[in-house]
């Protein structure tokens, strides 16, 4: 069974984990609906790239 040769210091441990931070999701302003939404996703009102791709009735039926 492997045993560490030396104690891992806090600095070594934290610098190794530095790339594991969370990133802020990319939000974009949708000019059609006037709301912010995640990029490459349909808005809550069913619009994508300025066109309505999902009707609002079918979007609310999934609740």
From Swiss-Prot:
It comes from the Bacteria. GO terms for biological process: translation. GO terms for molecular function: structural constituent of ribosome. One of its GO terms (cellular component) is large ribosomal subunit. Keywords: Ribonucleoprotein, Ribosomal protein. It holds the Pfam family Ribosomal_L32p. NCBIfam families: rpmF_bact. HAMAP family: Ribosomal_bL32 (MF_00340). PANTHER family: 50S RIBOSOMAL PROTEIN L32, LARGE RIBOSOMAL SUBUNIT PROTEIN BL32. Belongs to the bacterial ribosomal protein bL32 family. This is Large ribosomal subunit protein bL32. The lineage of its organism: Bacteria, Bacillati, Bacillota, Bacilli, Lactobacillales.
């Amino acid at each position: 069974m492997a045993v560490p040769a030396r104690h891992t210091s806090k600095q070594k441990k934290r610098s190794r984990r530095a790339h594991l931070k969370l990133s802020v999701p990319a939000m974009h302003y949708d000019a059609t609906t006037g709301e912010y939404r995640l990029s490459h996703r349909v808005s809550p009102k069913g619009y994508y790239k300025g066109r309505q791709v999902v009707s609002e009735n079918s979007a609310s039926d999934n609740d």
